[in-house]
Amino acid sequence: MTTTSTTTTNTTNGQFCSDESLEERRKRFLLEVDAKHERAHDKDDATKRFQYLLGLSALFRKFINLNASKDPAFKKRIREIDSKTSFKESSKKAKNSRRRKTEKEEDAELLQDEEHQDDEDHQHTVMTESPSYIKEGKLREYQIQGLNWLISLYENRLSGILADEMGLGKTLQTISFLGYLRYIKHIDGPFIVIVPKSTLDNWRREFAKWTPDVNVVVLQGDKEQRASIIKDQLYTAKFDVLITSFEMILREKSALQKFRWEYIVVDEAHRIKNEDSSLSKIIRLFYSRNRLLITGTPLQNNLHELWALLNFLLPDVFGDSDQFDEAFDNQNSEELDEEEKQRRQDKAVSELHQLLSPFLLRRVKADVEKSLLPKIETNVYIGMTDMQVEWYKRLLEKDIDAVNGVVGKREGKTRLLNIVMQLRKCCNHPYLFDGAEPGPPYTTDEHLVYNSGKMIILDKMLKKFKAEGSRVLIFSQMSRVLDILEDYCYFRDYEYCRIDGSTSHEDRIEAIDEYNAPDSEKFIFLLTTRAGGLGINLTSADIVILYDSDWNPQADLQAMDRAHRIGQKKQVKVFRFVTEKAIEEKVLERAAQKLRLDQLVIQQGRQMNSNNNVGNSKDDLIGMIQHGAKEVFENSKGTMLDDDVEEILKRGAEKTAELNNKFNKLGLDDIQNFTSDASAYEWNGQDFTKKGNNASLGLNWINPSKRVRKELTYSVDNYYKDVLKQPAVVKEKVVKQPVVKPKAPKSYNVQDHQFFADELVTLLEREQLAFKKEISYQYSVDDFGDSDEEFLEQDDEDDMTRDEKRKIAQEKINNAVALTEEEIATRDRLLEESFHNWSRRDFTNFIHATAKYGRNEYKKIAKALGNKKRSEIERYSKMFWQNYQKIEGYEKYLSQIEAVEKKREKLINQQKLLAKKIESLQDPLEDLKIQYPPNNSKRVYSKTEDKFLLYCVHKYGLSTENLYDKIKDEILTSDIFKFDWYIRSRTPQEIGRRISTLLLAITREMEGPLHGKKRKAMGESNNSSRFGSVEPSSINGEKHSPEVIDNEQTVKKLKL
C-alpha cells in the first residue's frame, strides 16, 4: 500500500507520547542488558530486510547464504523467508503460463492483503512537497527526492550512504528525515549524530533553524562538563538528538553504548573505512536499529574499503570481505582475448552497481542544480627557475643511490618519501629550504617572485584576475608556502585572508565573514588544502588556484567545492599548478589514475582521505623521483617561460585535455593493471629494468663508482644504530657476549626563538662530543662534501681541504672531556631556564597573540596558545623583548606586532574622543552634532541613526567583542526604530563600516583638519581597509557608496 504524504500538519508540536512518564521514556532510551542481547530481538527487522534484498537480485543471496552457512539460527530465518515467498513464486509461474487464477489462489492473496493492509510495514510514504515541519524555508525538488529515498530505506529496514556531492544539502536532508521519524512516525529518539569536531556547532545551528522543536544536546567539553551532560541530560532521557564528535565517541564509549539508538548518523563517514580502527570498532559495538553514513566521497580506491562501509551498514549481509573481493576480482584473465575481457569487465561493473543501488544515493551539482555552471579545470604547466634547478639537482645528488633505486628493504620507502617531499618543496619555492633566501637583511621584494616559476606565473595571473574583477582562492598543502604568499600579498598590496591548520575556530569564522562581505575589499583567500577544504562556503570567489596538488585527489576536489557550490553566480575556473619535467607531473598522473578508478567503480564517485596504494610502492616512488631528473642534470639553467599568460593558459588547457583523454580511454582492468604492473623504470619509451645496473637510468647521470658515497642520514636513531654496529670480522663461532651500549645524550635542535644560553649550547656540544669519543666515532672525508673542489666552492671562508677539516673535527672528539657533576647541574638549570619545548608554531602563535591582545596581556596570550601557562608566557615574553634581536628576521615579527598596536592605539584614541564629545552632552541622542564631510550630502543613514550608533559605541566600548552584533540587537529592540526598515535590515558588517566612517568624522572634527595630513605624511591612509573604510550602502539589492545614491532613492528610504 502506498500513501502520498504532504505533511501539512504539525499539531503535536514535538510532544509525543504525552501519557509517557519520564521513567517510561528513560526505559525506552536505555538498553536493558547490552547491544548483543537487544539485537536478538530484532528478528522482524532482519526478516524484512533480507526479504527485500533477496527480491532485488540473486547477487545478494550469494552473500546471505554465506552467512547462513555459518549460523544455524540465521539459516533457519532464511528458510522461513523462502517458504513465505514460495507462494508468490508459484503465482509468478502461473502468470508465465498464462492461465487464470483458481479461486483458492485468489482467496489466499486477498486474505494476505487484508491481513496486512493496516500493517505499518506495508505502507510506503512518498513526499510530494517540502514537509511543513521544516521551518525557515523549503526543500528543493532533489532534496525531497533524497528525503523519499531515506524514508524508503527506513521502511525496508536498510541502512544507507547519502553521498551527494558537497554543497547539495546533505545536512538538511538528514534533518528532514529525522523530522519525518519525529513528526510522522512519532519516533522522537534517541538519535545520535557523530560529526567532525569542527562542524559540531554547525549541526546544532542547522537543527535549530530547520526543526526548532527538536531537543538537541551537544556532548563536548572537558571531563567534568561531559560527566554533567551525561548524568543530567542523557541518562535522564532529556534529549531527542545527541550531537557529538569522533573524539568524544572514543572517550565516552562506555556511556554511549548503553543507549537504544534509533539511528546512528555518521558525517564524513570515510573515518570508519578501516574496520580495524578504534573508532570503527567502537561504533560497531553500539546498538542501533539503522545507520546512515553521510559523505561526499563514498567509494575508496579499492573494493575492500567499500566492503568496510557496507559491512558497517549491514554486517549480517556483508560479513566476509574475501568473498566480496573475489566476486569482483577481474584481473585473472590473461588468457582471454580483449573482447572477452571487456565483456567480463562490463559485467563486473554492472553487478557492482546492482549491489550498491539499494544503499547508495549519489547526485552531483551538474545534474540537480541547473543554474550552477560547470567548473573549468586547467592544469598550468610551469618551468623552473635557475635557482630551483640548482636546488633540485642538489636534492637528487644528496642521495643518488636512492634515486637510482639502490635502497634497503626497511628504510627504503621512508628514504624515497623524504626525497619526494623535498623535491615537491623545491617545485613550490626554493625559499622553503633554510638558507636559500638571500639575507640577512631579509627583504620583501621582487626576488620572492623571480626565484620561483610558480610565483612568476601566479604574479601574471593575479594581475589579470584583478583587472577582470575576479576574486581568488589559493590552496597549498604547505602552510609555509602560505607564509611566502602572505609576504607576496603584502608586497603587491593585495588585500587577503588566511586559514591554515593552526587557525582557531573563531578566527576562521571571522575571516570567512570578512571575505564574503558584500563589498569586501579582500582579493585573495589563502588556505591550506586540508584545513580549508571542509565546512567553508566561499562562493564570493570565482577563481581557484591549486598551488600544489594533494596526494589524495579528493582533497583537491573538496577545495574546489569551496567556490563551486550552490550560491555561485559565476563560472568557476580552477587552475592547478604543475611543474614541468619534474616530480609533480607524476603526482598529477597518479591523481588522474585514482579518479578514473573511482569513476569506473561507481558513476562519478568521490572519496576523501583515500589511503590506497596507488603510486605509493617503492617502484612508483622511484619513477616519480626519476621523472625529469635527466633534464635537470643536463641543463644547469632554468626553463622559465616568458610567454604571455594567455598563451600559457592555452597550452595548459591543451595538455589537460590530452591527460584526461589518456585516462578516459582506460577500462577497469587497464587501470588496475596500470596501478600494479606499470614499471617505474619505463622512461622515454625504454624499459631500463632489463639492463644491468651500470646501464640504469640513474647511473647515466653521474658516476658514483669512482668513490664509495657515505649514506647521509638525519635520523639520530639510525645514525647510532650504524655507529654501534659490531664489525663482522671473526668468522669462527664465538659465544656472543651482551654488548652494553652507552646511552646517547638527548639531542636538541637549537632554534633561535628558544633562547638557549651560549653556555648551554657549549655544554650540549661538549656532551655530544664526549659521547662520540666514548663510542670511538670517526669522521670520514665524505662527511665534508663530495670532492675538494666542490667543498672549496661551497665554503670560501678558508682554503682548507676536506681532510684538514676532518682532522680538526676529529681532534675535537679526541680531546672531548665528559661533563662534571657540577656542569651537568648547570646544564639542567639552563635547560629549565630555556624554552626548548617551544616549537616554531608556538612562537608564531605567540607573535600573533601578542599583536592581537597586547604585549602585557599574558592571560589572554596563554589562552590563545592553549598549551602554555600564564607564568611561562610572562617569562617568555620578557625574554623575547630583551633578546628579540637574536631571532633571524625579527624585523618582520616586530612590524607585525607594531602594526596591530597602531590599530589598537587608533581605536583607543577614537574611544577617548567619542567619550569626550558624548559626555559633554546632557542628552547625546538629541544634542549630539556630527560634522559630516562636504561630499556626504546624499548620505543614506539619518542623523538619528548615526547618533544612536555612536551612542551605542560609547556605551559598549570599541574593544568589546562582537560589538556590532550587540549594536544590531540594540537596534532591533529599540522603540526608536520600530518601523525603520532600513536600519533594522542592516547587517553587523554594514553597521561596523558605518561606525568606522562616523568615527573618522569625529576624529577629524576633534583633532582638526591638519590631522589627516599628518597621518598621510606618516604613511597612514585614511581609507585603509585595516583602519576604517567608507561605508557602501545597499538599496533594493544594489550596492552604492554614499556619494552616488540619487535623491529619488533617498526619498524612497525616508518614506519607508
UniProtKB/Swiss-Prot annotation:
It comes from the Eukaryota. It is found in: Nucleus. Induction: Expression is induced by the HAP43 transcription factor and repressed in response to high doses of peroxide stress. Catalytic component of the ISW2 complex, which acts in remodeling the chromatin by catalyzing an ATP-dependent alteration in the structure of nucleosomal DNA. The ISW2 complex is involved in coordinating transcriptional repression and in inheritance of telomeric silencing. ISW2 is required for chlamydospore formation, distinctive morphological feature of the fungal pathogen C.albicans that can be induced to form in oxygen-limited environments and has been reported in clinical specimens. CDD domains: DEXHc_SMARCA1_SMARCA5 (cd17997), SANT (cd00167), SF2_C_SNF (cd18793). Pfam families: HAND, Helicase_C, SLIDE, SNF2-rel_dom. One of its GO terms (molecular function) is nucleosome array spacer activity. PANTHER family: CHROMODOMAIN-HELICASE-DNA-BINDING PROTEIN 3-RELATED-RELATED, SWI_SNF-RELATED MATRIX-ASSOCIATED ACTIN-DEPENDENT REGULATOR OF CHROMATIN SUBFAMILY A MEMBER 5. The gene is ISW2. It is an enzyme of class 3 (hydrolase). Residues 833-885 form the SANT domain. One of its GO terms (biological process) is filamentous growth. This is ISWI chromatin-remodeling complex ATPase ISW2. Keywords: ATP-binding, Helicase, Hydrolase, Nucleotide-binding, Nucleus. Residues 151-316 form the Helicase ATP-binding domain. Residues 85-130, 1010-1056 are annotated as: Disordered. Belongs to the SNF2/RAD54 helicase family. ISWI subfamily.
